[in-house]
From Swiss-Prot:
<comment type="similarity">
    <text>Belongs to the ZapB family.</text>
</comment>
<keyword id="KW-0963">Cytoplasm</keyword>
<keyword id="KW-0132">Cell division</keyword>
<keyword id="KW-0175">Coiled coil</keyword>
<dbReference type="GO" id="GO:0000917">
    <property type="term" value="P:division septum assembly"/>
</dbReference>
<keyword id="KW-0131">Cell cycle</keyword>
<comment type="subunit">
    <text>Homodimer. The ends of the coiled-coil dimer bind to each other, forming polymers. Interacts with FtsZ.</text>
</comment>
<feature type="coiled-coil region">
    <location>
        <begin position="3"/>
        <end position="66"/>
    </location>
</feature>
<keyword id="KW-0717">Septation</keyword>
<comment type="function">
    <text>Non-essential, abundant cell division factor that is required for proper Z-ring formation. It is recruited early to the divisome by direct interaction with FtsZ, stimulating Z-ring assembly and thereby promoting cell division earlier in the cell cycle. Its recruitment to the Z-ring requires functional FtsA or ZipA.</text>
</comment>
<dbReference type="GO" id="GO:0043093">
    <property type="term" value="P:FtsZ-dependent cytokinesis"/>
</dbReference>
<dbReference type="Pfam" id="PF06005">
    <property type="entry name" value="ZapB"/>
</dbReference>
<protein>
    <recommendedName>
        <fullName>Cell division protein ZapB</fullName>
    </recommendedName>
</protein>
<dbReference type="InterPro" id="IPR009252">
    <property type="entry name" value="Cell_div_ZapB"/>
</dbReference>
<dbReference type="GO" id="GO:0005737">
    <property type="term" value="C:cytoplasm"/>
</dbReference>
């Protein structure tokens, strides 16, 4: 191989390595975003569960009050 071919090969390898490094950094950023979204999703699920329980409690209270009103009438 001539020096010119070796130089071109080296340039291409260097470009490929830089691309790989950039892709690794992007992958790490995406993993971090996914982790953040997963945590947020868990928080929202917990909040949803709490709100569902509160709604059930309020429905039971309202049903009880309506029952009292019906028995008074």
């Amino acid at each position: 191989m001539s020096l010119e071919l070796l130089s071109k090969l080296e340039t291409k390898i260097q470009a490929a390595l830089e691309t790989i490094e950039l892709l690794k950094m992007e992958l790490e950023e995406e993993k971090q975003k996914a982790s953040t979204l997963s945590e947020h999703n868990q928080q929202l699920n917990a909040q949803n569960q709490q709100l569902q329980e509160e709604l059930t409690s309020w429905n039971e209270k309202v049903t009880g009050l309506v029952g009292l009103l019906n028995s008074e009438i």
